Amino acid sequence: MTTALIFAGGTGRRMNSRSKPKQFLEMHGKPIIIYTLEYFEYHDDVDTIVVVCIREWIDELKGLLKRFGISKVSRIVPGGETGHDSIYCGLKSMKDICKKDDIVLIHDGVRPLITKQLITQNIEAAKKYGNAITSETARESIVRSTDGEIICEVPPRSQMYTAKAPQTFYYGKILDLYERAKRDGKKSIDSAHLCNLYGEAMHIVVSTPNNIKITEPADYYIYRALYEAMEGQQIFGL
């Protein structure tokens, strides 16, 4: 079985949106979280979806799922204090529906510009290599600093990538890593970072273009422009 774990537990402090969390902001009458969920809803290889959501917005999400015909969501789980905690909450809730060798795609609810092909590549790579980390080649030079003032390293750009999502794993393995982190008192930025903390080898799946995460106000307007450009290509054959 293949499960999509969508975490949408963030409050969106950097969006300056006082009325709604960022994942519930709408574009053309449809919330960002629904745009994201639709890719997994309509993918033949995804069997079920688990969503981690802000507790106070769970009822709102349930109504949206019904309104937009999202039927694969099998449960909605309250999120934690951090993204790490939210993913762990979701993984724990899946113990009764997932086997150790099932595939789980972990994806941001505010990353709606993925594709069917990217999901397929993640599933295939995870089955072959044990995991799949969607990554994008660096477009500019990356510098490293330990104190935020002095640059101590400029790695070759050809070797640098940005971790994106989905990040895909065998369920038993990724759950074990999160449980180890809990015992050790560790927190991670994302699942790829967690794998690195415990020395796990990771396999790259090259990201599709414009796989942005909507975090700040500018991201929303970039997303809207990109979405409308893609719509124009379909309509006008540009």
Regions from the language model: what does each represent?
Residues T2-D59:
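N-terminal glycine-rich phosphate-binding loop and ensuing alpha1 helix
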Residues I6, I33, G90, D108, ...:
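Residue-level signal for inorganic ion chemistry
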Residues M15, F40, L61-L65, N122, ...:
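Hydrophobic packing residues within well-ordered alpha-helices of enzyme cores
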Residues E26, L113, T168, K213-I214:
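Short aromatic/basic micro-patch
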Residues I34-D101, K182-D184:
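Conserved N-terminal catalytic core of the sugar/cofactor nucleotidyltransferase
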Residues C98-V110:
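Short beta-strand-to-loop acidic/aromatic patch adjacent to the donor-nucleotide binding site
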Residues L113-V205, L238:
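Conserved core of the sugar-phosphate nucleotidyltransferase
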Residues N211-L238:
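Hydrophobic helical membrane-anchoring modules
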